[in-house]
Amino acid sequence: LADPDSDLLSNADESRLGTDPFAFNLQTGHFVHDTWNRIYHYTVEDLRQSDDFYGEPTKSTMIAVDQVKDYSSYSGHRLRAHFTPTASGPHRFWLSARTSAQLWISEDDTPFRKRLHAQLSPNLGTGHGVQYRSRNLWDVFASQRSGEIELQAGRKYLVEVIAQHGHGGFSHVSLAWAPPGGEREPVPADLFGTLPNPADDQDDDSLPASWE
């Protein structure tokens, strides 16, 4: 279906919503979800070294923040969104996943300054992830928790989760946070929103075009 503004809403969808089909329309509470099928690996490290990961994904969709689950065996996944905190100060994040996963947060709203803040990997002794049906197990491994990250209220940051699923069911990815002075809780969905590819990275490989 036609999608000239690359916001993952077809022209038919935009007509129903009454939005401009030629201007990117942010969808609050959603990630952009890129999927690569037939990726026969078990770790994100292997996925990131695969040529397939830097090519076209099998599919790109929008997915609600609380619905990242039940994806197919032997598949790689990248979830991206802009995140806008409501308070300035130190934030902490937790990552829960059935399989190998990484949480990256950028210092701005582009992928060029992203940093790895939490992860699950067999290479860290975490097996293939939390390995449970529950999506809210935050303290199984120390590597699930980030350090304190200084963020500014109202500023957009790119958040990216990369996950590799081997085989088996009950796949899931979820995030929690502790805002300044607050307790840990699931990250509110309305702080996330879909995002376009940066103008300087239209091939979507997280490298500025000027570097290539």
Language-model regions, residue ranges each:
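Extracellular calcium-associated, cysteine-rich motifs in secreted modular proteins
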Residues: 1-29, 195-212
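Acidic/polar, compositionally biased interaction segments
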Residues: 24-204
